[in-house]
Amino acid sequence: MSFAEEFEANLVSLAHVLQKKYALLRDLDKSLQENQRQNEQRCEKEIEDIRRGRAGNITPNTSLTKFSEEALDEQKHSVRIADEKVTLAMQAYDLVDMHVQQLDQYMKKSDEVIRKEKEAAAATLELENNGKAGNAGEGGRGGRKKTRLATAASTAAASTGMTSSNMDLDLPVDPNEPTYCICNQVSFGEMVACDNNACKIEWFHFGCVGLKEQPKGKWYCPECATVKKSRKGR
């Protein structure tokens, strides 16, 4: 059970507990009011008896003494009821306060989880963007080869047996996109990198240089291969 589910279950339980405590508080309040009413009536009767002249009697009146003691006991009972009401109210307050603190902790945990998820998503997006930028400008030096996914135009050309050197692309081209190969066109389809560090073109379409698959080992474009052979012949 997750924290949210557990907290929701505790809230349902809290509602029932508070309902019982509030019902008991109402009962105690009614009892307290009735006890105070009866005690007030008793006190008023005693005061009325005193006014009628019984207070001037030097002989102790045991009935009045007993009456006063009963009134005092009733007043003490009212105090006990009031104390019980305060205890119940404090218990209800503590229960609500405990759940509020739990909710605060849950909100803090949720905020922390959301913050970490946002940071992870931002880091992933940055890595993807860096990877795309690296693929666009990555050189093929040191024998590294790169294969690009074919565009719709290059796929159609391959199915008809046409090479990129004699294929007329009608697709819109971004004027800011870099061009490659001896055909001086943008990157599409599978491409191979020349292993000559000084190669001016660097990347070539398979079809333009007569390749059908990635060459094994080092590979040099026609121009660099010619220069390399001429240097060996000297």
Swiss-Prot record:
Residues 149-165 have a biased composition (Low complexity). One of its GO terms (molecular function) is zinc ion binding. SUPFAM superfamilies: FYVE/PHD zinc finger. The record marks 180, 191, 195, 203 as: Histone H3K4me3 binding. Zn(2+) 1 binds at residues 181, 183, 205, 208. Ubiquitously expressed. Keywords: Chromatin regulator, Growth regulation, Metal-binding, Nucleus, Transcription, Transcription regulation, Zinc, Zinc-finger. One of its GO terms (biological process) is chromatin organization. Disulfide bonds: none annotated. Residues 129-166 are annotated as: Disordered. One of its GO terms (cellular component) is nucleus. It is found in: Nucleus. Changing residue 203 to A: Abolishes binding to H3K4me2/3. A zinc finger (PHD-type) spans 178-227. Zn(2+) 2 binds at residues 194, 199, 221, 224. InterPro entries: ING_fam, ING_N_histone-binding, Zinc_finger_PHD-type_CS, Znf_FYVE_PHD, Znf_PHD, Znf_PHD-finger, Znf_RING/FYVE/PHD. The PHD-type zinc finger mediates the binding to H3K4me3. Histone-binding component that specifically recognizes H3 tails trimethylated on 'Lys-4' (H3K4me3), which mark transcription start sites of virtually all active genes. Interacts with H3K4me3 and to a lesser extent with H3K4me2. Belongs to the ING family. This is PHD finger protein ING1. It comes from Arabidopsis thaliana (Mouse-ear cress). The lineage of its organism: Eukaryota, Viridiplantae, Streptophyta, Embryophyta, Tracheophyta.
